[in-house]
């Protein structure tokens, strides 16, 4: 199945609710979202929660929250596999009746004994198909005894090469002789991943599946299930894994790996969306900042690389800053608000004047509060170098009165400060850093005169008089 005018594209993201939404899963969801949107298709969300031991409702909720925050709005769902058990049972029965699957009554001990014998003989460990040779009478006898059973797919002996043209990796083929009669339904009645996902994807009309390359071993099994059920297979595409900068698999030791952690650290969803869309994909080597619509228009599975993608935090910080600069100052300040309130600070209208001065120095929304704590409170932090500047104890007497009498803009403030320094016999390069330390507790920052203009006049004068 390929993309053409008559195909209604439907992609899906199907996470297991066993934890937070990992950035790797978020990237998979994002690729499927972009693919569907590019072709006017449908993006479906399915929660694969058939494992009651590990699946938690709170994780499901957190995944939905993270996806919404990231801008991955689904068109259909969320469906829950746990509510579809009757559908899996229906297709299990169909395969049993058609002789394409069979009940396996082997115990764990019998299977381990089988594998041990194979190991001793130097053979690959695999199921030997013994239960496929049971007579109907033997099956009935075991059922009447209430013996538990799994259900296995009867892999055709003459199937030969299983091949598909991967949307990302190109032609892939595997010999069916490498596969044994694998389990479709466990002895507790729950479907295996491969069985449930095939039934779900087909009955939900999924046409294209983009997922991690760790699913490549699952693909031939799924193709065999599609064939057993007489269904057309969707298009498959397998994307490379994500590595940390040290070229090992991305994990907590590389920093945050959950989407909600990036939200809480002050990254814009637009920026993380942009970053993840380029993680392993390349469009223009000279450009890294895109809007969502541009990424939708550009998306092409063939542009996804064959090698693992490296998660570069510095690149994410850069993209985040650029997206902050793209926002109107009013909207950026509104995005900053929760981070200020978390520190017990209130956003005031005059803070808007600080945005153009500070945005170039910000990497995240949190940074506004860290860089400019002095606009929220007189109890601001004083950095080490500013403490050294303050220790010089340069004169301030009468300065507040001179500033109070002038027009409150950068040019007039600069003129007053220069004249004052000259009158006191102090070089401006020595005096201006001292003034910055007095009013902000910082040794570096935006233009001193523009900073003073942006700050409330009474706040600046109060601090000059107090010091």
UniProtKB/Swiss-Prot annotation:
Keyword Aminoacyl-tRNA synthetase among UniProt keywords: yes
GO terms under cellular component: cytosol
Pfam families: Anticodon_2 (PF19269), tRNA-synt_1c (PF00749)
Residue numbers covered by motif 'HIGH' region: 15-25
Compartment(s): Cytoplasm
Statement: the UniProt record of this protein carries the keyword Nucleotide-binding: yes
Primary localization: cytoplasm
GO molecular function, one term: tRNA binding
Motif 'KMSKS' region positions after renumbering to this chain: 249-253
EC number(s) on file: 6.1.1.17
Catalytic reactions of this protein: tRNA(Glu) + L-glutamate + ATP = L-glutamyl-tRNA(Glu) + AMP + diphosphate
A GO BP annotation: glutamyl-tRNA aminoacylation
UniProt-listed InterPro entries: aa-tRNA-synth_I_cd-bd, aa-tRNA-synth_I_codon-bd_sub2, aa-tRNA-synth_I_CS, aa_tRNA-synth_I_cd-bd_sf, Glu-tRNA-ligase_bac/mito, Glu/Gln-tRNA-synth, Glu/Gln-tRNA-synth_Ib_cat-dom, GluQ/Sye
Binding-site residues, ATP: 252
Keywords: Aminoacyl-tRNA synthetase, ATP-binding, Cytoplasm, Ligase, Nucleotide-binding, Protein biosynthesis
Classification via NCBIfam families: gltX_bact (TIGR00464), PRK05710.1-4 (NF004315)
Subunit structure: Monomer.
HAMAP family xref list: Glu_tRNA_synth_type1
Entry function: Catalyzes the attachment of glutamate to tRNA(Glu) in a two-step reaction: glutamate is first activated by ATP to form Glu-AMP and then transferred to the acceptor end of tRNA(Glu).
Similarity comment text for this entry: Belongs to the class-I aminoacyl-tRNA synthetase family. Glutamate--tRNA ligase type 1 subfamily.
This protein's name: Glutamate--tRNA ligase
Organism lineage string: Bacteria, Pseudomonadati, Coprothermobacterota, Coprothermobacteria, Coprothermobacterales
